[in-house]
């Protein structure tokens, strides 16, 4: 099959590959076509916001006929174990796992304090180690604090692009601190819907009156309330963020427990941890204020995500409650619903999941496939 390879300079070329080819084979093929200026050892290939690992195949990475992948060259030699760890040299003592490596700090046994120096959010001891490892992997491509600063510098140091610091920061913000997707945005352009203006950090105590930065945050909340309370299931608080107790810290996300939508989303993420990041992407379109808070306090968020789901058999009822009562769909959305039905699922079930996933066809398909056995038992 034919795929297109796009460079950071804006040019592109095509190569012939097979679905069973490994990413390492594709890198070798690119070096054969482009010569010494693209050595395989320094290549980093990105597809759909994901850095492709050498040992995986194109088919495993959903690379199909006429797909395009982005190629970058790192200034240091790539690790032969996989390109995901070779996106940039790690300056000073920052942790190298900032770009989606599985060796994250999630399995630690103690509850971490969400300070600015936390690299990636660590899951606390309230969940089993196996669970924390799974969710740690799902969240390992999110960076924050001083690690975020080093990631900005790493992207600037990688070469191949002419972006300035502000552009890199904008790309990271639009990608919700996912370095891999940010790099793709730098190359292909930042989608307009992904650009979220920075909002003020939630105040640590009930001193909003003394903190002028809190006022834009409060003013932004009513704007999210378009279309009624259930128009966007991923907008957990369409009528505005609930007021935190005066004694609650800024990192306290416990108020999410009272959100029926969050309970349903938590069940979906626990069933398929890999949808955590796309779920945050969709949530960010509806409630950027909440996503900012989640980004700043990822440890608290992972603690909530790890908590057992009460009444798992009622997940679909929760999803149904999160749906709008009356909705309109575009022709494109109707086609997406029909494609999901074509996979063999009941129309009512498809509609419930499709709207619960905020009309994201990929998320809906993943959820339907992961819960196929449950639907068959009903």
Curated annotation (Swiss-Prot):
One of its GO terms (biological process) is proteasome-mediated ubiquitin-dependent protein catabolic process. This is Ubiquitin receptor RAD23d. GO terms for molecular function: damaged DNA binding; polyubiquitin modification-dependent protein binding; proteasome binding; ubiquitin binding. Belongs to the RAD23 family. Residues 251-294 form the STI1 domain. It is found in: Nucleus; Cytoplasm. Residues 208-235 have a biased composition (Low complexity). The keyword DNA damage applies. Keywords: Cytoplasm, DNA damage, DNA repair, Nucleus, Repeat. It comes from Arabidopsis thaliana (Mouse-ear cress). Disruption phenotype: No visible phenotype. Interacts with 'Lys-48'-linked polyubiquitin chains. Interacts with RPN10 via its ubiquitin-like domain. Residues 146-189, 330-371 form the UBA domain. Transmembrane segments: none annotated. NCBIfam families: rad23. The keyword DNA repair applies. InterPro entries: Rad23, STI1_HS-bd, UBA, UBA-like_sf, Ubiquitin-like_dom, Ubiquitin-like_domsf, XPC-bd, XPC-bd_sf. Residues 80-118, 203-239 are annotated as: Disordered. Residues 1-78 form the Ubiquitin-like domain. The gene is RAD23D. May be involved in nucleotide excision repair. Binds and presumably selects ubiquitin-conjugates for destruction. Prefers multiubiquitin chains rather than single ubiquitins, with a binding affinity for 'Lys-48'-linked ubiquitin chains. Acts as a ubiquitin receptor that associates with the 26S proteasomal docking subunit RPN10 for the indirect recognition of ubiquitinated substrates of ubiquitin/26S proteasome-mediated proteolysis (UPP). Widely expressed in the whole plant.
């Amino acid at each position: 099959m034919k795929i297109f390879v796009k460079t950071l300079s804006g040019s592109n070329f095509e190569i012939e590959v097979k679905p069973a080819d490994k990413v390492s084979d594709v890198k070798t093929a690119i070096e054969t076509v482009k010569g010494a200026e693209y050595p395989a050892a320094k290549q980093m290939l990105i597809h759909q916001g994901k850095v492709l690992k050498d040992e995986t195949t194109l088919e495993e990475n959903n690379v199909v006929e006429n797909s395009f992948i982005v190629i970058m060259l790192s200034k240091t030699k790539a690790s032969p174990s996989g390109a995901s760890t070779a996106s940039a040299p790690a300056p000073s003592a920052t942790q190298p796992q900032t770009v989606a490596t599985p060796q994250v700090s999630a399995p630690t046994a103690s509850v971490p304090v969400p300070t600015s120096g936390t690299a990636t959010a660590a899951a606390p001891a309230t969940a089993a180690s196996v669970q924390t490892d799974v969710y740690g992997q799902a969240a390992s491509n999110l960076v924050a604090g001083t690690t975020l600063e080093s990631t900005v510098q790493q992207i600037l140091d990688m070469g191949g692009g002419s972006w300035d610091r502000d552009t890199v920061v904008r790309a990271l913000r639009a990608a919700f601190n996912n370095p891999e997707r940010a790099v793709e945005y730098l190359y292909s352009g930042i989608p307009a819907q992904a650009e979220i203006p920075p909002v003020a950090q939630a105040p640590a105590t009930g001193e909003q009156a003394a903190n002028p930065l809190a006022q834009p945050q409060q003013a932004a909340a009513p704007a999210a309330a378009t279309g009624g309370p259930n128009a966007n299931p991923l907008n957990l608080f369409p009528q505005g963020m609930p007021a935190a107790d005066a004694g609650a810290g800024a990192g306290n996300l416990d108020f999410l427990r009272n959100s029926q939508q969050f309970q349903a989303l938590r069940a979906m993420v626990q069933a398929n941890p890999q949808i955590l990041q796309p779920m945050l992407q969709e949530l960010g379109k509806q409630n950027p204020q909440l996503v900012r808070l989640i980004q700043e306090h990822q440890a608290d968020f992972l603690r909530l995500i790890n908590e057992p789901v009460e009444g798992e058999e009622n997940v679909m009822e929760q999803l149904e409650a999160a749906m709008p009562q009356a909705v309109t769909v575009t022709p494109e959305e109707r086609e997406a619903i029909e494609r999901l039905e074509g996979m063999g699922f009941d129309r009512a079930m498809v509609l419930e999941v499709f709207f619960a996933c905020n009309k994201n066809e990929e998320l809906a398909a993943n959820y339907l496939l992961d819960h196929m056995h449950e639907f068959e038992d009903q």
